[in-house]
Regions:
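A generic structural signal for short beta-strands and their flanking turns/coil linkers
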Residues: 5-7, 17-19, 38, 63-69, ...
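Short, charged/polar surface micro-motifs in flexible loops or helix N-caps
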Residues: 16, 26-29, 47-50
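Hydrophobic residues in beta-strands and at strand termini
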Residues: 23-25, 73, 119
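Active-site helix/loop of acyl-thioester processing domains in fatty-acid/polyketide metabolism
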Residues: 39-59
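Hydrophobic beta-strand-centered segment that forms part of the acyl-chain substrate-binding groove
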Residues: 52-83, 88
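HotDog/MaoC-like acyl-thioester-processing domains
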Residues: 75-121
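Non-catalytic linker/capping segments at the edges of enzyme domains
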Residues: 1-22, 26
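A conserved, well-ordered hydrophobic junction motif at loop->secondary-structure transitions
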Residues: 25-26, 30-44
């Protein structure tokens, strides 16, 4: 994905049961206070979630589009990296629901994201 490359994220696992990607902390991805920007956290989670949804599409589907995305931010990140892990919660004919946990380098939960993806036919 172009955005994922622009952010500098790297995927380490890419299959229908789980998609993982890592994003290193960088000053250009931060708020004025030096915290990793929530938009960067959400962009990583959205990218892994979209990939997971795509891998779980029913036969003869064209793709997905996000109809809802909810993020709970639980802690800030001032250094190191984050890793997003996306897993399917529901894979239906018309909707795919993905849950993504974003953790810091110490395995602390940074954010939990739930995405609902409409299946395009």
């Amino acid at each position: 994905m172009p955005l994922t490359r622009t952010l500098g994220a790297t995927f380490s696992r890419y299959d229908k049961d789980e998609v993982r990607a890592r994003l290193d902390w960088a000053p250009g991805l931060c708020t004025a206070n030096g915290l990793l920007h929530g938009g960067a956290v959400m962009a990583l989670a959205d990218s892994t979630g979209a990939a997971c949804a795509f891998l779980n599409l029913p036969d003869r589907s064209q793709g997905t589009t996000t109809v809802e995305s909810k993020t709970n931010f639980l802690r800030g990140v001032r250094d190191g990296y984050i890793e997003a892990v996306s897993r399917p919660l529901h894979t239906g004919r018309t909707v795919v629901v993905i849950e993504t946990d974003v953790r810091d380098q110490n395995d602390r939960l940074v954010a939990r994201v739930t995405q609902t993806q409409l299946v395009l036919t």
